[in-house]
Structure formats: C-alpha cells, structure tokens
Amino acid sequence: MSWHCSSGAAERRAADAETRRLVAKFAPAQEQLVDATRRWLRKRLPTACEVVYEYRSWFVISYSASAQGYEGVLGIRGDGDGVKLYFQQGKGLPDPEKLLRGAAQARWIAVESASTLARPAVASLADEAIARSTVPFEATGRGAIVIRSKSAK
C-alpha cells in the first residue's frame, strides 16, 4: 500500500471544501487566520500533504511528507479558543525567545494573528523543524489534501 500524496484537481477541490467546512464548524471566528496559516505553511512545504483530522471539538491539519499524519512536521489545530501552530518534534528545537509551549515532544505556538507568523523567530522555528524532518518531502509537485475519518462522537 502506497501512502504517497497525490490527487486530481476535482479531488483536491472536494477535500479543500471539506477542510473549510471543518474550520467553519470548529473555529468559525478563525477562518481567515486558518487560511493565512495554511498559506504560510504551504509556502514552506509546497509538496507536503495536508492531512486533516476532525476530533470532538477541534480540527487538526498535519503537514506530512506522506498521507500518514503522524509523520507530519508541522500542524495546525483550531477550535473555538483559537489557532495553534504545532511542531511535532518541537522538544529539541532551539527556541531562544521561548515561544514554544507544551511539555511533551510536540510543542506549539498560539497564532493570535497573521503578525505571529511574520515574526522571524517563528519562521526560524518552522524552518529548523523542516530541516530536521526524518521523512523527506518530494522535491517537486503539489501535496494533496487528505481527509481522515471522523472521530467517534
């Protein structure tokens, strides 16, 4: 079984529409911020798969070299309380400005506005996380959007 990300234009449009539906459902006040964060991540990882999960009260978009979300390097979590930028292997990242939150392997930054993403320290953390990825990303192409099954309600 191949876990490579690829999809046609129609599949991509349908998956993007489902992603937007989930964002509107779980983080309606944050739709523009989620869009800005997705664009910011897609600029850094144009060939990454956006692996989208729905949980009880939030959504997650993992940016992965494959259709396996657990291989994701960076991610977005959104809910009614806001948007977070996740660093899956954030524990070992150099963070001189102490931006990363959390105590486990994965760490996160609250994305309060698009200006958060414009901070050089945030860009540096993301770029370092990508550089440390153990799963290589495709050199060319465009990553697919992969919708994973809904969680049990």
Give the location of each predicted region.
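Charge-dense, helix-prone N-terminal extensions
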Residues: 1-153
